[in-house]
Each structure stands twice: as structure tokens, then as C-alpha cells.
Amino acid sequence: MRFTENFERAKKEALMSLEIALRKGEVDEDIIPLLKKINSIENYFTTSSCSGRISVMEMPHFGDKVNAKWLGKWHREVSLYEVLEAIKKHRSGQLWFLVRSPILHVGAKTLEDAVKLVNLAVSCGFKYSNIKSISNKKLIVEIRSTERMDVLLGENGEIFVGEEYLNKIVEIANDQMRRFKEKLKRLESKINALNR
């Protein structure tokens, strides 16, 4: 398989890109130890990652990422006050409160390596993990969990929900954040099993 032949070069390129991103402060700090562990394993390398986030986003319509604007973004638990401050910045389009679980893309040397990683990730609670793509250049595993939240808060400067409701969704979001951060810790503690 060509992706196996190209593995060493792809890993070298990915590690160089990660080093640049680390220097620029573009990598979520709490996921760095896990990335380093994965990258230290001979048959794997990370290509992109997010440790999970809570956000408030303004966009012309749902799904328009190109024209979307972050009003608040956190890779940690968030307070109601922080969310309210982000909401105050809303002017036009739709206003969304979003939770996204962690996502990691990992290159694997062989199909067997990819399957081992998917099985490990699923056993750690990342139920949506899968083999994302197979090409001549790379074999990519996507590690992803189930936590997600999409709540429309307002549109064109008008807010549809009250503070009591916002407080409840912030509580739920923080609960999801704690849950997926625990899954990341579990994965980090078990990732060395791939060395066997």
C-alpha cells in the first residue's frame, strides 16, 4: 500500500507542522501531552487536533463556517458571565451556543495499526472514532466523541432566551466538557498500549 511507503515522509512533515504550531501557541495546551505520546509511537503521528470547546458564534446561517465569527471560545469550563459577555457582541445573523467534543486526526502506518487505534479510542469512550481516509499519501484515523450541543440563542441582535435558560445550557456544556476531558485523560493513560 502506498500510504505505508509514504509514512515516514508524512510523519516527518506532520511533526514539523506541529512544532511550528506549538511555537505559535496554536495547539490546545491540555492536549499537548497526548499528542507527544502519540507522536512518540513509531507507527503513528498526529495531523490535527482540538481538545474540545464551548463557543458562542455568530453566523449568517447555521453551517456557514466561512462567514462565521467567534464571539467567545473556550477549551475549558465556562462561566455564565463569560457567555453573557460574548452574547453582548452579537449584531447580525444567527447567534449559536456550541459544544464540540475533542477531535484528533492520526496517521497510521498500516491498516492493522489504524484498527488498533480505533478500537483503543472507542474503548476510552470516543464512540465516533473511525478510519477517516485512505489515500496513497496517508491513512488517517479520526478520534471523536459523542458530546455536542447546538443551541440557537438569537438572530439579528435579538436574543431569544433568558438568563435562567442560559445558565442551564452552560451547566450542561460544562458537564459535557468534564466528560470529554476525562476521556482524553483515559486515552492518554492507555495510548502506550499501541507500542505492543
Swiss-Prot record:
It comes from the Archaea. The keyword Zinc does not apply. The keyword Repressor does not apply. Keywords: Methyltransferase, S-adenosyl-L-methionine, Transferase, tRNA processing. Its EC number is 2.1.1.282. InterPro entries: Taw3, tRNA_yW-synthesising, tRNA_yW-synthesising-like_sf. It holds the Pfam family TYW3. One of its GO terms (molecular function) is tRNA methyltransferase activity. PANTHER family: TRNA WYBUTOSINE-SYNTHESIZING PROTEIN 3. S-adenosyl-L-methionine-dependent methyltransferase that acts as a component of the wyosine derivatives biosynthesis pathway. Belongs to the TYW3 family. This is tRNA(Phe) 7-((3-amino-3-carboxypropyl)-4-demethylwyosine(37)-N(4))-methyltransferase 1. It comes from Pyrococcus horikoshii (strain ATCC 700860 / DSM 12428 / JCM 9974 / NBRC 100139 / OT-3). The lineage of its organism: Archaea, Methanobacteriati, Methanobacteriota, Thermococci, Thermococcales.
